[in-house]
Amino acid sequence: MADVMERVTKIIVDRLGVEESEVKLESSFKEDLKADSLDVVELVMELEDEFDMEIADEDAEKIATVKDVVDYINNNQ
């Protein structure tokens, strides 16, 4: 899980311009990391590329926290 978390964190830091220390499993994209809906869509696209997977729209809509992303990737790779 650490490798997935590291890769997810790097993408979030690069895309949202937040500090790495702000990215925690419990961090909410919209409330804690100040991402808007377009940011989340772009994050999902980058995550799909990074992990060579497709995240269905209905699944992407359920992603609210960093933990949601990490769990989704771990469960669907």
UniProtKB/Swiss-Prot annotation:
PTM note says: 4'-phosphopantetheine is transferred from CoA to a specific serine of apo-ACP by AcpS. This modification is essential for activity because fatty acids are bound in thioester linkage to the sulfhydryl of the prosthetic group.
Q: Which GO terms describe its biological process?
A: lipid A biosynthetic process
**Where would I find the Carrier domain in this sequence?**
2-77
Named from the GO MF annotations, one term is: acyl carrier activity
Keyword Heme annotated:
no
Q: Which domain of life is it from?
A: Bacteria
Q: Provide one Gene Ontology cellular component.
A: membrane
- Residues with the modification O-(pantetheine 4'-phosphoryl)serine, per the entry, are S37
Broad class of where this protein is predominantly found: cytoplasm
The alphabetical list of record keywords is: Cytoplasm, Fatty acid biosynthesis, Fatty acid metabolism, Lipid biosynthesis, Lipid metabolism, Phosphopantetheine, Phosphoprotein
By its UniProt entry, which InterPro entries does this protein fall under? ACP, ACP-like_sf, PP-bd_ACP
Q: Where in the cell is it found?
A: Cytoplasm
Q: In which pathway does it act?
A: Lipid metabolism; fatty acid biosynthesis
Write down the PANTHER family for this protein, in alphabetical order: ACYL CARRIER PROTEIN (PTHR20863), CARRIER DOMAIN-CONTAINING PROTEIN (PTHR20863:SF76)
Family to which the UniProt record says this protein belongs: Belongs to the acyl carrier protein (ACP) family.
> What function does the entry list?
Carrier of the growing fatty acid chain in fatty acid biosynthesis.
The entry's protein name is Acyl carrier protein
Give the originating organism: Shouchella clausii (strain KSM-K16) (Alkalihalobacillus clausii)
Give the organism's phylogenetic lineage.
Bacteria, Bacillati, Bacillota, Bacilli, Bacillales
